[in-house]
C-alpha cells in the first residue's frame, strides 16, 4: 500500500503510529483536516486483524469526522484514534494513560472523545495525561440545526437539506 499517496489523495494531514510495549499499546492517530479547527474524533478500541486494517480504519473514520464536524457547523476538523486491542480483555488504565501521552504530543491538533470500545471512564484516564481531549463529547453526532427536523419512525431524526433527505441514527457516541 502506498500510504503517503493515499493520504495525499484523500486530503489527510498526519498519521501518528503509537507504540508502548511496556503496557501493550499499539495505536494510530489520524488527522484528516484542521482547516476549521483542531481534529476531533473518538478513540476506537478494537482487535484489528492487522496493522494495515487499523491504519485504514483510522484514515477512513478521520475523514468522516471532518465531514460530520463541517455539517454540524462546528469549529473542528476530523481525526480518529484507534487502539489495537480487545476492549474487554486488554484495555487497562496504563494503556489508556499511555495513549493520552501520545495525544498530548500533538499539542492540541487532535481532541480525543469516546467511540466503540471506549467509555467515559476510559477518557478520564486519557485525560490524566493530556488536557487535549480525554473527555466525553457533549456534542450530538447529528446536527440539530438544519432547515427542518422531525422525529423519524426509528431512532433519531430525519433532516431536510434543501432538497435531498438524509436519515441519521440519533446522537450516538460513535463515528
List each language-model region with its residue ranges.
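N-terminal glycine-rich anion-binding loops that anchor highly charged ligand groups
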Residues: 22-38, 70-75
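Short, Gly/Pro- and small/polar-rich lid/capping loops
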Residues: 1-19
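Short helix/loop capping segments that flank catalytic or ligand/cofactor-binding pockets
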Residues: 26-27, 54, 93
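Gly/Ser/Thr-rich helix-start
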Residues: 25, 38, 42-43, 78-82, ...
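Residues in well-ordered beta-strands of folded domains
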Residues: 17-19, 30-32, 46, 84, ...
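N-terminal cap/recognition module
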Residues: 31-66
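GHKL/Histidine-kinase-like ATPase module
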Residues: 12-17, 23-30, 42
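Glycine/serine-rich phosphate-binding loop and adjoining beta1-alpha1 elements at the start
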Residues: 69-71, 75-174
Amino acid at each position: 500500500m502506498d500510504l503517503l499517496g493515499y493520504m495525499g489523495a484523500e486530503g489527510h494531514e498526519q498519521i501518528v503510529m503509537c507504540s508502548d510495549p511496556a503496557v501493550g499499546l499499539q495505536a494510530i492517530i489520524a488527522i484528516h483536516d484542521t482547516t476549521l479547527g483542531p481534529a476531533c474524533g473518538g478513540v476506537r478500541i478494537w482487535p484489528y486483524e492487522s496493522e494495515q486494517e487499523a491504519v485504514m480504519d483510522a484514515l477512513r473514520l478521520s475523514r468522516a469526522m471532518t465531514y460530520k464536524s463541517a455539517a454540524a457547523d462546528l469549529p473542528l476538523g476530523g481525526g480518529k484514534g484507534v487502539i489495537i486491542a480487545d476492549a474487554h480483555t486488554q484495555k487497562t488504565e496504563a494503556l489508556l494513560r499511555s495513549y493520552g501521552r501520545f495525544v498530548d504530543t500533538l499539542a492540541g491538533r487532535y481532541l480525543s472523545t469516546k467511540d466503540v470500545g471506549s467509555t467515559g471512564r476510559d477518557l478520564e484516564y486519557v485525560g490524566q495525561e493530556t488536557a487535549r481531549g480525554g473527555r466525553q463529547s457533549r456534542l450530538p453526532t447529528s446536527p440539530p440545526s438544519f432547515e427542518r427536523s422531525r422525529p423519524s419512525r426509528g431512532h433519531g431524526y430525519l433532516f431536510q437539506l434543501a432538497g435531498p433527505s438524509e436519515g441519521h441514527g440519533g446522537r450516538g457516541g460513535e463515528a
